[in-house]
Design a protein with these regions (language model features):
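C-terminal partner/receptor-binding element of secreted or periplasmic proteins
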Residues: 124-158
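Bacterial N-terminal signal peptides
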Residues: 7-15
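Mature extracytoplasmic domains of secretory-pathway proteins
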Residues: 49-118
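N-terminal export/targeting and maturation segments
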Residues: 19-64
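Positively charged n-region of N-terminal signal peptides that target proteins for export
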Residues: 1-5
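A structural detector for beta-sheet-dominated domains
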Residues: 41-43, 56-58, 72, 91, ...
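Solvent-exposed loop and beta-edge segments used for protein-protein assembly and interaction
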Residues: 32-34, 47-49, 82, 125-127, ...
């Protein structure tokens, strides 16, 4: 009798932990008017503590090929009440700013991906939950996976 009490909770835990990732999407509301929801399901890695995900939000813009440009705005993280999941939100993209290097007016414009300004936005790598980002219509969400090893190096005293 005692054994069955022990096995039942383990069985229940195993059933709950194998719920498909699609079921987790129920926690994330649909995008509001003027916004688009982007979803990334990460593949499982052997040691996910050694990886990070960089979220990159921007837009394709036809501009000169010389100056450096960026959009104002920021990625915010919000906790979803009752679920404990995090969603990421960019409320507005822009205005665009950049350097003012003189450009030949006859120089043809090129299509470039212009991102939000500021530091890279890194989040924990977690293949068990989707990464969900809400952005204004017309914006694009890209990502990079950053990996390292478990080795570390000592710094010299100085």
């Amino acid at each position: 009798m005692k054994v069955s009490h022990c096995i039942m909770p383990l069985w229940l835990f195993a059933a709950v932990s194998t719920v498909p990732a699609q079921d987790n999407m129920k926690a994330f509301p649909p995008a509001e008017a003027g916004m688009v929801r982007h979803v990334l399901q990460l593949p499982k890695q052997e040691d996910e503590s050694l990886a990070k995900v960089e979220l990159i939000v921007g837009k394709q813009v036809k501009i000169d090929p010389i100056n450096t440009y960026f959009f104002s705005g920021q990625i915010e993280s919000e906790n979803i009440e009752g679920w404990g999941f995090t969603r990421y939100l960019v409320k507005q993209l822009g205005p665009m700013a950049g350097t003012l290097i003189g450009v030949d007016p006859d120089e043809p414009k090129v299509l470039r991906f212009i991102t939000l300004g500021g530091e890279p936005f890194l989040i924990r790598y977690n293949s068990r939950l989707p990464v969900v980002v809400y952005v204004p219509e017309g914006a694009e969400v890209r990502f990079r996976i950053w990996n390292t090893t478990s080795e570390s190096s000592s710094m010299k005293k100085g």
